[in-house]
Amino acid sequence: MNKKQKKVLARIIIAVVLMIILHFIPVKGIIRFLLYMVPYLVIGYDILKKAFKGIKNKQVFDENFLMAVATVGAIAVALYENGDYTEAIAVMLFYQIGELFQSYAVGKSRKNISELMDIRPDYANIEVDGKLTQVDPDEVVIGSVIVVQPGEKVPIDGVIVDGSSTLNTSALTGESVPRDAKCGDEIISGCINMSGVLKIKTTKEFGESTVSKILDLVENSSSKKSKSENFISKFAKYYTPAVCYSALALAILPPIVRILFMSAEPQWGIWIYRALTFLVISCPCALVISIPLSFFAGIGGASREGVLVKGSNYLETLSQTRYVVFDKTGTMTEGVFEVAGVYDNTLDREKVIEYAALAESSSSHPISRSLQKAYGKEIDRNRVTDIEEISGHGITAKVDGISVAAGNYKLMKKLGLSYSETDKVGTIVHIAIDGSYEGYILISDKIKPTSAAAIKALKKAGIKGTIMLTGDSRTVADSVAAELGIDEVYSELLPGDKVAKVEELLARKGSKEKLAFVGDGINDAPVLSRADIGIAMGAMGSDAAIEAADIVLMDDDPLKIAKAIKISRKCLRIVYENTYFAIGIKLICLVLGAVGIANMWLAIFADVGVMVIAVLNAIRALFVHKL
């Protein structure tokens, strides 16, 4: 509980004690009025001050105005009729109790999220003259060597140049299993070093590091509001003035009707009391507070599981997802390619791999990296000239002055060369050297252990269609799709074809159904942007993924996709529960108040009680671990 909350609690206790004491003091008239004004002002002076400031700034209609008018009106009625000021003070007292509870609940939610996302490093260690010096992470330049001791957070992305350790990545991924890290491994900020001392050569500035990107994403998520939140904001804008005018009509019209048409007593006191009760009931706090809190808690609960949502609008869209489109490589498969064999070659296996690795040396594609890994020697780029990358086909280059072509069967066709056809499952890289076909290299990629379970989980979650897009051959694509149980597969696609295919799938679905695209974020930015919702997987260290996607999964587990959808649906379910509950109770109590059945005590429940219940319900969105 912060200082401000403690102050409000103290005022509540003082007001309650004063009311109990006053209950046993038998005074009447103006002295009774003055005595009861003490607890009223103790508990309500800030509300009156805010209401007056709102009137002064021409922002009249808010909950402070409603409470001020209702309580001042109740005091006026009591002053001229029965001298019972208890109800007026009770309205203000319980309103403040509700506000305190709401403030504490929101603070608790924020604290939970900030603890879960407690990855911001306070300092970085730099070795100066053999001694460790703590500096601000912002001051560390690229290429510096920082030292991370056991128990410390890794402050900046880099590469380990000395030492080995285990890393706790739970704040980023939601997974508690430690990861081993050794010399030569890339390491990202936000992890906690658990055992050995690590020396890390930084590859980014702090502002561009993973930890900064994630914190920026989480902090800005509240600015992107959902349709539900925007509706509530607009609703409150028109609702509050409407109920104020309705209360005014309730106070004035019935007495006038009684005088003019019924020749009866106007009963001003009764109708003013009903109007004031009507005002207290109508306060929209439960909706205005609980709806944004539900989304805030939902985003916080998701971040706890390593699912970063860029805004409540994306959480709302995700809940309506009925079709999920996957990229194959790095999403459903490991994306770690290895050379499985060289076939139909006339040259030595090593020579074929050498030519292929050198020709592909300028590419950062995983297949190129696998060829370079199989070659196993340092790449001498001076040996390679005239490199030309042909999109969707492969690469041509000159190695030691000899022309080399490495790519798929389309490249061989383009060059007018006959090639070997095969039904082997894997990525086939055909090789032509000096205008002659020299066989093919088979490169394999393993399916992730949780991919099949992820597809089952999505279908169980009500996803109508699972679709896989890949640039791989039809044989490989069909084999992977069959093994995983994916409904549709489209293979041999060029990068531009994926966007066109997603456009086609978007046109095919229902107007209220949403389509999500899941990729590894490396080459998928256009498709991630085009889908209704873009989900990037394995985004630890990938700036492109964090920038392009609407939702970021911090690790490589495809099971998190179904979990993210379940989290979004739980959050939206809570939003609808709070909306229907708050509006339903208020409508019933408004009718009861207007006809004189509901008194001020029921009005307090309809306002404060409903708000407390709605806030408690909203906080449930934080707890998503068992989904």
Features from the language model and the residues they span:
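Soluble-to-membrane junctions at the N-terminal ends of transmembrane alpha-helices
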Residues: 1-14, 45-75, 215-249, 321, ...
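Transmembrane helix-loop-helix hairpins at the membrane interface
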Residues: 2-123, 234, 241
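Helix-interface capping motifs at the ends of transmembrane segments in multi-pass membrane proteins
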Residues: 17-34, 53-62, 68-88, 241-280, ...
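Conserved catalytic phosphorylation-site environment of P-type ATPases
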Residues: 63-70, 172, 273, 283-359, ...
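Juxtamembrane coupling segments of multi-pass membrane pumps/enzymes
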Residues: 65, 90-150, 181, 306-309, ...
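Conserved cytosolic catalytic loops of P-type ATPases
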Residues: 115-208, 313-356, 398
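P-type ATPase nucleotide-binding
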Residues: 339-465, 474, 486-502
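Conserved ATP-binding TGD loop and adjacent catalytic N/P-domain core of P-type ATPases
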Residues: 401, 427, 433-577, 585
